[in-house]
């Protein structure tokens, strides 16, 4: 399976980079993992709703340009479907079983994802009703993907 994470913004925090590198290394035994970053837009402090939508559209255009046409796209969004780690593992296994060899997870910027990106998504996933920094979501997502592969292979993993 080839898994890509397409995300808005460049990581700067060393602790996040270290964690992402660790999980990318661990996952290399199970799948090919790519992390693709697209430029984020500066959001004015008191941006209007229209300005925020325009920013999401510009970021969304960059995200869509990085998604292969034959990929199964999972958008991370608060309004997405919540799953347990076991359900998420079963879903990844199901995608592999049905020949979905390219899976792309999309993480938006601080304003979220554009309507165009949400329309392109084959499904949406939520990790919580809480809001997390989009940079941190990359690490959380990688950990859950790693956990899913361990669950699917019957390998021990900390609960």
UniProtKB/Swiss-Prot annotation:
| Reactions catalysed according to its record | pseudouridine(1915) in 23S rRNA + S-adenosyl-L-methionine = N(3)-methylpseudouridine(1915) in 23S rRNA + S-adenosyl-L-homocysteine + H(+)
Binding residues for S-adenosyl-L-methionine, per the UniProt record? 76, 108, 127-132
Which Pfam families does UniProt cross-reference here? Answer: SPOUT_MTase (PF02590)
Q: Where in the cell is it found?
A: Cytoplasm
Report the domain of life of the source organism: Bacteria
In its UniProt record, a GO molecular function of this protein is:
rRNA (pseudouridine-N3-)-methyltransferase activity
Q: List, alphabetically, the GO terms of the cellular component aspect.
A: cytoplasm
Q: EC no.?
A: 2.1.1.177
Assign the protein's first listed, main location to one coarse class.
Answer: cytoplasm
The stretch of residues making up the signal peptide is none
Q: Which UniProt keywords apply?
A: Cytoplasm, Methyltransferase, rRNA processing, S-adenosyl-L-methionine, Transferase
The job of this chain, per UniProt, is described as:
Specifically methylates the pseudouridine at position 1915 (m3Psi1915) in 23S rRNA.
HAMAP family reported for this sequence: 23SrRNA_methyltr_H (MF_00658)
Q: Which family does it belong to?
A: Belongs to the RNA methyltransferase RlmH family.
PANTHER family found in the cross-reference section: METHYLTRANSFERASE, RIBOSOMAL RNA LARGE SUBUNIT METHYLTRANSFERASE H
Self-association and partners: Homodimer.
Q: What is this protein called?
A: Ribosomal RNA large subunit methyltransferase H
Source species of the chain: Geobacillus kaustophilus (strain HTA426)
């Amino acid at each position: 399976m080839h898994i890509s994470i397409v995300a808005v913004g460049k990581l700067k925090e060393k602790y996040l980079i270290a964690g992402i590198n660790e999980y990318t290394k661990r996952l290399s035994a199970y799948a090919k993992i790519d992390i693709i970053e697209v430029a984020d837009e500066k959001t004015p402090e008191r941006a209007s709703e229209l300005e925020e939508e325009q920013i999401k559209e510009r970021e969304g255009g960059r995200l869509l340009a990085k998604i292969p046409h034959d990929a199964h796209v999972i958008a991370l969004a608060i309004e997405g479907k919540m799953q347990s780690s076991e359900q998420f593992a079963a879903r990844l296994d199901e995608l592999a079983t049905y020949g979905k060899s390219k899976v792309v997870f999309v993480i938006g910027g601080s304003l979220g994802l554009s309507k165009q990106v949400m329309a392109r998504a084959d499904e949406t996933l939520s990790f919580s009703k809480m809001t997390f920094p989009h940079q941190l979501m990359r690490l959380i997502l990688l950990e859950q993907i790693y956990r899913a592969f361990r669950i699917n292979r019957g390998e021990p993993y900390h609960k």
